[in-house]
């Protein structure tokens, strides 16, 4: 059923609001994907707080006008699904991971930090660890010297007790 003018304006406003908060936008061609697979992709996107939507390209172009994602408008051709996220890598990671298991989802382009990326750029962005993973690695690196020192003190205390006994 075609959208009337008010519905189109509402869609553009909704997508523009998402784009205004976003750090990353990823475009992927979804030709030939089964409905069940698309539902799975949407569920994974929801878990990662990624706004994922199939849009008419003209409406998407209007939504990105005047934003840092405006250069992506040139890439908006064909049947596309749009992944939009506030997290810098979440949209790229969700779409890239799904495209590995389903060859019918083809990453077309993306934009991060005002720069348009091709498929390789989106895949490179997706390979970056998440903020939580980076924080846990940093914490481990910071704890390693302290825990090593604590183990050395414990070993020294055991040695002293063994000598005293």
From Swiss-Prot:
GO terms for cellular component: ribonucleoprotein complex; ribosome. GO terms for biological process: translation. Coiled coil: none annotated. CDD domains: Ribosomal_L10 (cd05797). Keywords: Ribonucleoprotein, Ribosomal protein, RNA-binding, rRNA-binding. One of its GO terms (molecular function) is large ribosomal subunit rRNA binding. InterPro entries: Ribosomal_uL10, Ribosomal_uL10-like_sf, Ribosomal_uL10_bac, Ribosomal_uL10_bac_type. Pfam families: Ribosomal_L10 (PF00466). Belongs to the universal ribosomal protein uL10 family. NCBIfam families: PRK00099.1-1 (NF000955). Forms part of the ribosomal stalk, playing a central role in the interaction of the ribosome with GTP-bound translation factors. Part of the ribosomal stalk of the 50S ribosomal subunit. The N-terminus interacts with L11 and the large rRNA to form the base of the stalk. The C-terminus forms an elongated spine to which L12 dimers bind in a sequential fashion forming a multimeric L10(L12)X complex. This is Large ribosomal subunit protein uL10. It comes from Burkholderia multivorans (strain ATCC 17616 / 249). The lineage of its organism: Bacteria, Pseudomonadati, Pseudomonadota, Betaproteobacteria, Burkholderiales.
């Amino acid at each position: 059923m075609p959208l009337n003018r008010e519905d189109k304006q509402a869609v553009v406003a909704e997508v523009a609001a998402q784009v205004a908060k976003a750090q990353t936008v990823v475009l992927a061609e979804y030709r030939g994907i089964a409905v069940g697979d698309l539902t799975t992709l949407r569920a994974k996107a929801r878990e990662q707080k990624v706004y994922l939507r199939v849009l008419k390209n003209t409406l998407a172009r209007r939504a990105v006008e005047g934003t840092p994602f405006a250069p992506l408008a040139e890439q908006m051709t064909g049947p596309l699904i749009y992944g939009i996220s506030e997290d810098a890598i979440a949209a790229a990671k969700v779409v890239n991971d799904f495209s590995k298991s389903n060859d019918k989802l083809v990453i077309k382009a993306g934009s991060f930090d005002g720069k348009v990326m091709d498929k390789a750029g989106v895949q490179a962005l997706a390979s970056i660890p998440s903020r939580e993973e980076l924080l846990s690695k940093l914490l481990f690196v910071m704890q390693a010297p302290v825990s090593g020192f604590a183990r050395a003190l414990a070993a020294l205390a055991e040695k002293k007790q063994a000598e005293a006994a």
